[in-house]
Design a protein with these regions (language model features):
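Single conserved hydrophobic/aromatic residue that forms the stacking wall/gate
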Residues: 1-9
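Hydrolase catalytic cores
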Residues: 13-19, 52-55, 142-143, 205, ...
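Short acidic, glycine-rich surface-loop motifs adjacent to enzyme active sites
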Residues: 14-15, 45-73, 96-97, 212
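C-terminal subdomain of the subtilisin-like protease fold in secreted/lumenal serine endopeptidases
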Residues: 22, 29, 58-60, 65, ...
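Catalytic cores of secreted or luminal carbohydrate-active enzymes
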Residues: 61, 78-108, 364-366
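Extracellular S/T/G-rich loop segment that most often corresponds to the catalytic His/Ser-adjacent loop
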Residues: 103-192, 209-210, 236-318
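Noncatalytic modules at the cell exterior or secretory-pathway interfaces
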Residues: 197-213
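Edge beta-strands of jelly-roll/beta-sandwich modules across compartments, strongly enriched
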Residues: 215-226
Length: 375
């Protein structure tokens, strides 16, 4: 038993096992960086859900993890599963939106009808063993790509074919590039183009994107998250929007951005929305800069990042669940009920428009949420 978030609550921590070695090697993730598989995270959530059911207790799940990989639409496996769990009575899920807004790891593409192709430039520093890029386009858009090396050698346009794959080794750079085309998801059929650069040479790499069948001409590219590459890799013309990490894009999950309480300013690295489907994310922002709290080995530490904001938000959700379910003020309560309650009570500045891609519906205000119930 612990005290602090509510009068009395029980804390359950699930330790995830590290990802398999062959996956680290495939995605070029350094050994020193913690990384976990999506299916293991889903198993952890399932375990907590079963445990809460056995004990007939409300459950707040805090996920302070994120990824730039995977489907950003409604077909992502982890996001879909969290939505299912969050719809259940006495369940609430909170996720951080990530710290990728200023990492220059997102490119927002737009091909006009009169354009033959659009060029996307990627800067790669020296001694990079490899990296990958995921390009996503919502159905019915279809694209094909070609790649130019820093010395000007060109991998010609690889024609689109679902399930098609091509590999090419650049002569001077000795960089191996593989390109895979996929149509993903059970409901949407969005296009994924996966580009993997092995033994990546230093310099500016150019990816030319060719329209095959377009309506809007919109597409997005993402590089791996910070620390998931062994050096600095970024888009020269990056875009800070649509940088919410998975599963912060899940519809039923309470997605928390971050801000600095000391000056009221946005935490600049806080992931920004909206989602690719236009859904408002983040839902709101919580303190994320120099947050003081318990750490390992019975010590208190200072933390910065949206993971800290998610932890604070999870505590607020526990307070609301205690008020509603334990004290029986609102016995039918789910993640959506808590989210709407916090959104209605959020503090909103007069000089900003809402909903906002950076701030969502404002900043977390638990007192304001309860005050709103009195009106």
């Amino acid at each position: 038993m612990s005290r602090g978030l509510g009068d009395v609550y029980k804390r359950q921590v699930v330790k995830l096992k590290e990802t398999k070695t062959y996956l680290r090697e495939f995605y070029f993730i350094p050994d020193s960086v913690p990384a976990y598989q999506e299916n293991d995270i889903m198993m952890a959530v399932s375990y907590l859900d079963r445990l809460a059911k056995e004990r007939d207790m409300p459950l707040v799940i805090c996920i302070a993890l994120g990824s730039n990989m995977g489907n950003r639409g409604k077909d992502g496996q982890l996001a879909t599963y969290l939505d299912i769990v969050s719809r259940r009575r006495k369940r609430c899920s909170v996720a951080a939106v990530g710290n990728e807004a200023n990492a220059r790891h997102h490119f927002l593409g737009k091909i006009q009808p009169d354009m033959e192709y659009e060029s996307v430039e990627v800067s790669v520093e020296e001694n990079i063993p490899g990296f990958f890029i995921e390009m996503w386009a919502n159905a019915p858009e279809l694209y094909a790509v070609s790649v130019s090396s820093p010395t000007g050698e060109v991998l010609p346009k690889v024609p689109y074919r679902s399930g098609g794959r091509q590999e090419f080794v650049f002569i001077f750079e000795q960089t191996r590039v593989s390109i895979d085309y996929r149509l993903t998801g059970r409901r949407q059929g969005n296009q994924l183009i996966y580009l993997r650069f092995s033994n990546a040479a230093q310099g500016i790499w150019t990816i030319n994107v060719y329209p095959q069948s377009i309506v809007t001409g919109d597409y997005n590219m993402w590089l791996p998250m910070r620390n998931f590459t062994s050096g600095n890799v970024f888009f020269l013309r990056s875009n800070p929007n649509h940088t919410i990490t998975v599963p912060g894009n899940a519809g039923q999950v309470i997605s928390t951005g971050g801000y600095n309480v000391a000056n009221g300013c946005l935490y600049l690295d806080s992931g920004r929305g909206f989602t690719l489907s236009g859904e408002v994310k983040p839902d709101f922002c919580a303190p994320a800069v120099n947050v003081y709290g318990p750490g390992l080995r019975n010590r208190f530490v200072t933390m910065t990042g949206t993971s800290a904001a998610a932890a604070i938000t999870a505590g607020a959700c526990a307070q609301i669940m205690e008020w509603g379910l334990v004290k029986r003020n609102q016995i039918f309560m789910s993640s959506a009920d808590i989210k709407n309650m916090l959104i209605r009570g959020a503090d909103r500045a007069d000089d900003r428009s809402y909903p906002n891609p950076s701030w969502g519906y404002g900043t977390l205000d638990v007192y304001g949420a309860f005050e709103d119930l009195r009106r």
